[in-house]
């Protein structure tokens, strides 16, 4: 695999960097004894963002490593590896799983993550 990040990996990396900053804001909220419900909302926003990053990585894996493995005759092993990777990921396998849509650009209706640093 190439050392250069794919567009999807860059998107996931950028999202994770945003999450890191958001988590720092949540820590500050807790340290300043912020209202519990406000903290819970921010934690939910981070969880949602992590789930989106995971979906982006799934799309990337399917388009790169997985497809290469299938073309190279290692399809069954690739399928087993993928099943093992997602079986404990409710956002990918649960009743509300959203695997479709724009993985990199995100949908136009998606709301941006609130900025916890201003809380």
Swiss-Prot record:
Location of region: Disordered: 99-119
UniProt lineage: Bacteria, Bacillati, Actinomycetota, Actinomycetes, Mycobacteriales
Subunit structure: Homodimer.
Domain of life: Bacteria
Effect the entry attributes to changing residue 15 to A: Loss of ability to bind to DNA
Species of the source: Mycobacterium tuberculosis (strain ATCC 25618 / H37Rv)
Record-given protein name: Copper-sensing transcriptional repressor CsoR
Location, primary (coarse class): cytoplasm
Cross-referenced InterPro entries: Metal_Tscrpt_repr, Metal_Tscrpt_repr_sf
């Amino acid at each position: 695999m190439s050392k250069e990040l794919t567009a999807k990996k860059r998107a996931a990396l950028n999202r994770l960097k945003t999450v890191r900053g958001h988590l720092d804001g949540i820590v500050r909220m807790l340290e300043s004894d912020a209202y519990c419900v406000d903290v819970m909302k921010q934690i939910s926003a981070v969880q949602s963002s992590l789930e989106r990053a995971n979906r982006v990585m799934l799309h990337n894996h399917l388009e790169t490593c997985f497809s290469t493995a299938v073309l190279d005759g290692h399809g069954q092993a690739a399928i087993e590896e993928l099943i093992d990777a997602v079986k404990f990921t409710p956002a990918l396998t649960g009743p509300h799983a959203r695997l479709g849509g724009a993985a990199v650009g995100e949908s136009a209706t998606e709301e941006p993550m609130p900025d916890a640093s201003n809380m």
